[in-house]
């Protein structure tokens, strides 16, 4: 009878183990369907780019598209043509010099100017300068989400700081956000992204996808995107992504993952 009990317990353990493996593999299988849905996300980006019209738009009357890709609300795209190849200096006015951003774009006739670092729920002043001509834009943005956690205390020695942005990602729920030296939100994603956010050598950001491949925190992979929110690449990993990655000198990525099939 004792042997029968041991055999019975052993069989029960094997059955439980097989069930756990089945559930794990089923989650991975379900993720294949979710990954296919990214195609529609990319199609959505292409559809939005149809609004990026340049014909007939000038420095005096540019095409201004707020949140051009639908997931980065404090950005805009300013589009216009010039008769000659011209440089454009863009200034996004802040509350002080450490929160004001200026950049000069290379000379061209067709100008697609990404605008980052707008304030939420404000008419932002953005100045375009082409030679001796200046155009002041007022770009209105929406309010921040009501469930966004905001800084309660900000201490900064501005004499030792520049006008950098400080990027933060949540470890569970929350928003991927960039703050300026005053603690004001100047950029955020509506996409749910976890773990690390870093800027690649080419200037793009690398963030997690918003889709879970396995509990408790394995995401399907990573998105490479620009600050406007345009996804330029997706890296899908059979073992998911969690916590950390690193860009190697040769441009390859070293990513923390797992092997769900090992069970």
Question: Which sequence ranges carry the predicted segments?
Answer:
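Polar/charged alpha-helical tracts
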Residues: 2-6, 36, 40, 230
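Extracellular ectodomain segments of secreted/surface proteins
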Residues: 26-83, 150-155
């Amino acid at each position: 009878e004792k042997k029968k009990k041991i055999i019975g317990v052993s069989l029960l353990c094997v059955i439980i183990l097989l069930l756990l493996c089945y559930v794990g593999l089923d989650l991975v299988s379900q993720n294949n369907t979710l990954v296919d849905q990214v195609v529609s996300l990319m199609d959505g980006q292409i559809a939005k780019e149809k609004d990026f019209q340049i014909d007939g738009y000038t420095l005096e009357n540019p095409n201004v598209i707020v949140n051009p890709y639908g997931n980065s609300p404090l950005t805009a795209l300013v589009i216009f043509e010039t008769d000659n190849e011209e440089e454009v200096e863009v200034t996004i006015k802040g509350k002080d010099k450490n929160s004001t951003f200026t950049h000069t774009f290379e000379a061209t006739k067709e100008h697609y100017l990404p605008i980052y670092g707008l304030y939420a729920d404000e008419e932002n002043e953005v100045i375009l300068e082409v030679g001796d001509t200046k155009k002041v834009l007022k770009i209105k943005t929406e309010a921040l989400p009501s469930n966004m956690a905001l800084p309660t205390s900000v201490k900064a020695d501005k004499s030792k700081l520049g006008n950098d942005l400080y990027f933060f990602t949540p470890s569970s729920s929350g928003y991927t956000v960039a703050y300026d030296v005053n603690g004001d939100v100047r950029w955020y994603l509506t996409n749910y992204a976890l773990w690390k956010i870093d800027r690649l050598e080419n200037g793009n950001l690398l963030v997690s996808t918003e889709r879970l491949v396995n509990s408790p925190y394995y995401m399907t992979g990573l998105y490479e995107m620009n600050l406007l929110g345009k996804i330029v690449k997706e890296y899908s990993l059979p073992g998911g992504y969690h916590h950390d990655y690193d860009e190697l000198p040769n441009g390859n990525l070293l990513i923390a993952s797992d092997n769900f099939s090992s069970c």
